[in-house]
Amino acid sequence: MRDPWPRLRELPFPPLRRRALTTLQVNLGYRCNIACLHCHVNAGPTRKEEMTRETIDLVLRFLAEQRVRTLDLTGGSPEMNPHFRDLVRQARAMGVHVMDRLNPTIVEEPGYEDLPDFFVEQRLELVASLPCYLEDNVDAQRGDGVFASSIRVLQQLNQRGYGQPDSGLILNLVYNPQGPSLPPPQVALEADYRRVLGERFGLVFNQLYTLANMPIKRFGSVLLSRGQFDDYMTLLQGAHRDENLEQVMCRDLISVDWQG
């Protein structure tokens, strides 16, 4: 696998000033039940890296001492870490808002079928990846059957109140392009998602986030191998808008990897 980091270090980026810390993002490990082309940490079923119990205890201590308002859990599939549920319970007991960056298909894996009930019990905010509303596009990016599985799980979540008006159970979806291109305008694409998913599957959700693929790790390596890295970086730089810097996550977020 080719490393894009040396090329990224050469690129200019406008200086940023941090704000007060509000969110702690924690990567609980690189294990995932699927392996996606765009994944920026090379997650997959064969990865073994995961956060230990000792490091999770440090996370909880940090939450308490720094009075962080939001815990943002990611992976891999964060739910595959054996300490996921205990971390969530303890964080929620502190009054911390917890977000789970969810690959919906994990719910259909053996041993994870009760996750929707756990999500409701702890009132987690779910950020579920669904990179398109068309089956062929999703399965081409993530593997055969991923779209159908994702839809079934999202329907389960809707049945438990997620995404429903006035339930307080937040279900947001995430779109990302299949390749080295920019996502469509978010407002228009969200309307398309609502129409297609609602008409075909009866699905509802709170909000759609559109993300550009990060040119690092697996996706960055593919770009380098295909000779598309420079063109993609030019595309990203051409789309830069200074006003978007107000919303950059790293200004009030600290991201912690599985090693702590």
Q: At which residue positions do the language-model features occur?
A:
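Conserved alpha-helical substructure of the radical SAM core
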Residues: 1-75, 79-96
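Core AdoMet radical
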Residues: 23, 43-52, 66-81, 92-111, ...
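Short, acidic, Ser/Thr-enriched surface-loop or helix-capping motifs
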Residues: 256-258
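Radical SAM enzyme [4Fe-4S]-AdoMet core and its adjacent flexible, acidic
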Residues: 134-252
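Generic structural signal for well-ordered alpha-helices
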Residues: 24, 60, 88, 116, ...
